[in-house]
């Protein structure tokens, strides 16, 4: 079957999470396209509030949605804010995906994460490895929320015929990343640690692996 690419030209496009690394990159890219670009600040609408999200969708009628909004962080953040990572990310994903369906969005792309795969999944990772084993404990709440989002996309596509898809970026870094010493992702954290070590002339660098510090 030949797949027909979705044409964004002339569409109203909503980037959820436009201030994050992925979302801001999408905004920069879409700025060069013939689209009506919609973004939404946290102060305007709490994406964890289903009623507020539904009202915004009904008023703005986005035709395409890039769902890059999420509460994210590194090992320390995932370990210490487990309830927040689960609740916030579940609410964001379920609210936006359902609102997109209710308001007949033509296309939605949900950004997953490589942490959805089992800790001991065979390498290289395969898509069908999801839900075949235990998750990495340090980011299990975040991973569970992402899995729910992926499954919502699958089920809304199969039951309602929604043109919703998921993509799985892995170890992203770049412009707009978070380089906080405790709450950043692995690549950004390593860049900061090695940069600071070189600047200070340090002989050793402390790095984290499954929640334990190594020198």
PLM segments and residue spans:
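Conserved Rossmann-fold NAD(P)-dependent oxidoreductase catalytic core, especially the SDR/UDP-sugar
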Residues: 94-139, 165
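SDR active-site strand-loop-helix element
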Residues: 16, 40, 65-71, 108-114, ...
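NAD(P)-dependent short-chain dehydrogenase/reductase
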Residues: 120-129, 151-214
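Adenosine-cofactor binding site in Rossmann-like domains, unifying the SAM/SAH pocket
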Residues: 31-56
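N-terminal Rossmann NAD(P)H-binding glycine-rich loop of SDR-like oxidoreductase domains
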Residues: 4-30
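NAD(P)H-binding glycine-rich loop region in Rossmannoid oxidoreductase-like domains
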Residues: 50-90, 99-102, 119
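Conserved cofactor-binding/catalytic machinery of classical short-chain dehydrogenase/reductase
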Residues: 49, 64, 88-92, 107, ...
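Active-site helix of classical SDR
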Residues: 141, 145-148
């Amino acid at each position: 079957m030949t797949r027909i690419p979705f044409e964004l030209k002339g569409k109203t496009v909503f980037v959820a999470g436009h201030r994050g690394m992925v979302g801001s990159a999408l905004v920069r890219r879409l700025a060069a396209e013939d689209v009506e670009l919609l973004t939404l600040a946290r102060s305007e609408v709490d994406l964890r509030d289903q009623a507020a999200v539904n009202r915004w969708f009904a008023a703005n009628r986005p035709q395409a949605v890039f769902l890059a909004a999420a509460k994210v962080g590194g090992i320390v953040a995932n370990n210490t804010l487990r309830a927040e990572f689960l609740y916030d990310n579940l609410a964001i994903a379920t609210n936006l995906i359902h609102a997109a369906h209710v308001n007949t969005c033509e296309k939605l792309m949900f950004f997953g994460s490589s942490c959805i795969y089992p800790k001991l999944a065979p390498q290289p990772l395969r898509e069908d490895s999801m839900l075949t084993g235990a998750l990495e404990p340090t980011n299990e709440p975040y991973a569970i929320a992402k899995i729910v989002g992926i499954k919502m996309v699958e089920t809304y596509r199969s039951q309602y015929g929604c043109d919703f898809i998921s993509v799985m970026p892995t170890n992203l870094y770049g412009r707009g990343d978070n380089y906080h010493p405790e709450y950043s992702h692995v690549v950004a954290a390593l860049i900061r640690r090695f940069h600071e070590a070189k600047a200070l002339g340090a002989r050793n660098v402390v790095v984290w692996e499954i929640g334990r510090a190594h020198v």
